[in-house]
């Protein structure tokens, strides 16, 4: 039963004021990527720059072309501006673990447009051999976080997953499934393939 002693009017008024201040649009919600572990005394920006510079020297032992240096500086500046350093460091760490343990892996997709990903060993597409368009991968205007696809050899994927669980903890890492729906045409085509029926039939 309501009474003013239990629920003073001034407190009720204040709760209404608080609720008004809690109104927001879902458009305002932004995912904040967790900070990655970095060596003591370094910031995530410093560490990403150090790893990229080290990879640059490995990829081009006799020195990279001028445009590659410019491209890397452009990419690192945008990565810093959009606060994506931790994401790159996480993917680098996982790929580095795989390579040190002779687990086959390959970065693919729009990340191949990144000279930084090439220097970090995430992708294997030499940016001097293609006309890279970094903005296909990360763009200030698109305002979407980067998405680096990395494939690992099927037989040893479990080792990668266990490494991630050990490093980040099971409360901070999870498997995510992508579910697709078959359309009639593609379903019939795949059934035909499985039954070795020619598509023309």
Residue locations for each model-derived region?
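Phosphodiester-processing cores and adjacent nucleic acid-binding clamps
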Residues: 1-201
């Amino acid at each position: 039963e309501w009474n003013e002693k239990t629920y003073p009017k001034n407190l009720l008024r204040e709760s209404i004021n608080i609720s008004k201040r809690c109104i927001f649009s879902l458009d305002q919600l932004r995912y904040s990527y967790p900070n990655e572990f970095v060596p003591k005394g370094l910031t995530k920006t410093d560490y990403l720059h150090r790893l990229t510079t080290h990879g640059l020297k490995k990829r081009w032992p006799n020195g990279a072309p001028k445009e590659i240096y410019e491209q890397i500086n452009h990419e690192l500046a945008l990565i810093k501006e959009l606060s994506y350093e931790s994401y790159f460091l996480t993917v680098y760490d996982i790929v580095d673990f795989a390579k040190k343990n002779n687990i086959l892996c390959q970065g693919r997709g729009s990340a191949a447009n990144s000279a930084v990903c090439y220097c970090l060993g995430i992708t294997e597409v030499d940016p001097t051999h293609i006309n890279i368009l970094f903005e296909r991968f990360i763009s200030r205007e698109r305002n979407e976080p980067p998405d680096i696809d990395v494939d690992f050899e099927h037989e040893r994927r479990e080792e990668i997953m266990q490494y991630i669980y050990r490093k980040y903890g099971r409360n901070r890492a999870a498997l995510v499934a992508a579910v697709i729906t078959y359309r009639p045409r593609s379903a019939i085509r795949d059934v035909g393939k499985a039954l070795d029926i020619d598509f023309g039939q």
